[in-house]
Amino acid sequence: MKIIFPILSNPVFRRTVKLLLCLLWIGYSQGTTHVLRFGGIFEYVESGPMGAEELAFRFAVNTINRNRTLLPNTTLTYDTQKINLYDSFEASKKACDQLSLGVAAIFGPSHSSSANAVQSICNALGVPHIQTRWKHQVSDNKDSFYVSLYPDFSSLSRAILDLVQFFKWKTVTVVYDDSTGLIRLQELIKAPSRYNLRLKIRQLPADTKDAKPLLKEMKRGKEFHVIFDCSHEMAAGILKQALAMGMMTEYYHYIFTTLDLFALDVEPYRYSGVNMTGFRILNTENTQVSSIIEKWSMERLQAPPKPDSGLLDGFMTTDAALMYDAVHVVSVAVQQFPQMTVSSLQCNRHKPWRFGTRFMSLIKEAHWEGLTGRITFNKTNGLRTDFDLDVISLKEEGLEKIGTWDPASGLNMTESQKGKPANITDSLSNRSLIVTTILEEPYVLFKKSDKPLYGNDRFEGYCIDLLRELSTILGFTYEIRLVEDGKYGAQDDANGQWNGMVRELIDHKADLAVAPLAITYVREKVIDFSKPFMTLGISILYRKPNGTNPGVFSFLNPLSPDIWMYILLAYLGVSCVLFVIARFSPYEWYNPHPCNPDSDVVENNFTLLNSFWFGVGALMQQGSELMPKALSTRIVGGIWWFFTLIIISSYTANLAAFLTVERMESPIDSADDLAKQTKIEYGAVEDGATMTFFKKSKISTYDKMWAFMSSRRQSVLVKSNEEGIQRVLTSDYAFLMESTTIEFVTQRNCNLTQIGGLIDSKGYGVGTPMGSPYRDKITIAILQLQEEGKLHMMKEKWWRGNGCPEEESKEASALGVQNIGGIFIVLAAGLVLSVFVAVGEFLYKSKKNAQLEKRSFCSAMVEELRMSLKCQRRLKHKPQAPVIVKTEEVINMHTFNDRRLPGKETMA
């Protein structure tokens, strides 16, 4: 019998039942959670605690399960396996065990050999393999089931290269841990050919953590710019060993490629001055990231104690952060693929997971803002792209962010954009510096005291005052040490080694060189200099020449011998010209008998002797009874008078100085005079800047001087300025030295003087080791002292001496025989000459009288002498009876000084 329920056939009832069943199914489905398993394989050291990656793996899974925001209907479980380091066989076995259990993805292991084994299995069975450490990828990589959250090292290598270029390094040492380091830093290794970079590559010891032999070798080689490619554990050990070896100073700059530099304990190095730079991918400035790291730290501190790795307690390492982000990225793909189920896979059957390809595509397409910033993958090779790195550097407050780097825009240094005011004392405040110097008066000298002095109190001088002012401005303390070899610093041509203060700066035995250290080209190539605190040049120190009294003929000195000769020639020439013109000019002839105007005899006063007498009278400013009548002769006379006026005035003006002032005649007046002679020896301080100047000079004069000095190196080059000054005083020696020191010496020793001007121009600066961060600070402080006038005041303090007594004025000094004795000699010579001439005239006249009176020469001479000795009138000699001569003959006769007037008739 068939029972019929009418209500079941009711359409409304049917719709209601369907709705209730649908609601029940929805409620059941919402109350049911899907379980998904992740696999993790982690290396461990035997008897060691759980690693950071495994802790982060578990922490991430637990966080997702607790929050229920990412996977509200899925519960994640995990299976973790531990393997020994570098055990690829065990890694393969553990991977197969997890695949047989059924896992959606396998995380780890980290090391390349084990990772490659697991990757091979995952790729064959279609299960995603997630890596958080760098692994070398070949160009034809076919591992499609692989992603890595670690930044691509080709990008990291470019970031390091950008840092090197930013710091303007010219020499770099790369220290790597294993052979993969050369692959990771390939962009940097290719740089020398493109960026003029000198690269030195070293490898850390593989079988020990003792890096001291390597560090010692680097210290000996003065390798101050170093890039370390190693783990954070090794980095912590290197820093400790470098500190013990004195390599944690401001002259060293280390770049670490590990992204865990921020997690190292840098407390012992904060005030060492060392420059330490690295990268950080963990976005600690994000508040959500900071909250997660804080929770991680709490759980991390509850974990078993870890061995001493140099890491700060509770800090999340980069590997841990990447593992945390990896779990979340895979979870994002799970969220987008809810119908995915896992199944047991067997390694020996080679049957891939049917959801693997789709799931792997979702993982590569996933985007996530995690602890390490933006996470996106290259869909072809699975490598991470488009990430940001923070550039961090060690400061006194610890590691601070100073910039950012990303693959698109490169390096962006933001340290100067923090809004902090510039403070030049930041890197020098409260630091203790070693200062090398050299004894050189007045720059550095021992302080005179009755009590024993110690330390810096032993010294005083210009450079000591300068150092004290710099320390006041910059806030540093210092210890003064005298240079061991007592030299400034020069390079040996044979081996290229330096000595003196320059050597101590190169070897970092001193932080500063505050001394009269000249800034030169060759020194600037090996050390750094501040701006000059004093400018100067090379000059010549020589004995002040002894004064020479004027000689008896010093009245001739106002005019040079050439001028005297020219005056004599001019006198002779003018006298002859006057004689000739007077003979030719008709207006110079006159009638000797003005009472007889009809006389045809005329005479000319300017005979040859009278012409010479006229010239002498004008030259002596005395004149003569002879006066020119013609215009032509007057022109000659006027020009001669003007000439003698200028000559006599110039002579008179200079005569007083030459007769009253002692002449200081020096055998040398310039460097050219030194180079042209060999009698006076000359030299400089050995291995000093002055010697180097002549040694490197290409100017012929200075090159010739260096040839002289080098040929007599043992005898002319001295050890110090004091030795050179003493030699100038005691021998015929000229000392080449700085003009400022010459100025100081001549103020205190009146027997010395500076010869000539400056040979070159240079400056004294504060020396620092190459690349020292102190140079710019000291330069600013020196400029400040210069603007305040303190440099000038210090120079006045140390250069101002008692001075040499001024020479007494000799304007009113009486002239002695030694001054004008020559004039008396000339007078005496003139008198003697006149006597001889008078005797000659007497004899000549006596002979004429004897001929005229027809008697003997002796009687005529006696008669002439008798008449000359009488102080009465003398009678004119009467000649014999006149001889009758015809009128025509008388008219035609005339002397050399007269002539007959033209046009007169012959006398009858």
Swiss-Prot record:
Effect of E187Q: In a breast cancer sample; somatic mutation
Residue(s) carrying Phosphoserine: S846, S868
Pfam families (UniProt xref): ANF_receptor (PF01094), Lig_chan (PF00060), Lig_chan-Glu_bd (PF10613)
GO cellular component: dendrite cytoplasm; glutamatergic synapse; hippocampal mossy fiber to CA3 synapse; kainate selective glutamate receptor complex; mossy fiber rosette; perikaryon; plasma membrane; postsynaptic density membrane
Subcellular location: Cell membrane; Postsynaptic cell membrane
Catalytic reactions on record: Ca(2+)(in) = Ca(2+)(out); Na(+)(in) = Na(+)(out)
Effect of T660R: In NEDLAS; causes profound slowing of channel deactivation and constitutive tonic current activation compared to wild-type, indicating altered channel gating kinetics; may decrease cell surface expression
Effect of Q621R: In RNA edited version
Residue ranges that the UniProt entry lists as topological domain Extracellular: 32-561, 657-819
Phenotype for A657T: In NEDLAS; gain of function; when incorporated into kainate receptor, produces constitutively active channels with significantly altered gating kinetics; may decrease cell surface expression
Expression sites by tissue: Expression is higher in cerebellum than in cerebral cortex.
Glycosylation sites per record: N67, N73, N275, N378, N412, N423, N430, N546, N751
Record has Ubl conjugation as a keyword: yes
Glycyl lysine isopeptide (Lys-Gly) (interchain with G-Cter in SUMO1) crosslink, residue number(s): K886
Gene3D superfamilies, A to Z: 1.10.287.70, 3.40.50.2300, Periplasmic binding protein-like II
UniProt note on regulation of activity: Cold receptor activity activated by temperatures between 10-19 degrees Celsius.
UniProt family annotation: Belongs to the glutamate-gated ion channel (TC 1.A.10.1) family. GRIK2 subfamily.
Subunit structure: Homotetramer and heterotetramer with GRIK5. Tetramers may be formed by the dimerization of dimers. Assembles into a kainate-gated homomeric channel that does not bind AMPA. Can form functional heteromeric receptors with GRIK5. Can form functional heteromeric receptors with GRIK3 and GRIK4. Interacts with DLG4. Interacts with NETO2. Interacts (via C-terminus) with KLHL17 (via kelch repeats); the interaction targets GRIK2 for degradation via ubiquitin-proteasome pathway.
Record's protein name: Glutamate receptor ionotropic, kainate 2
Name of encoding gene: GRIK2
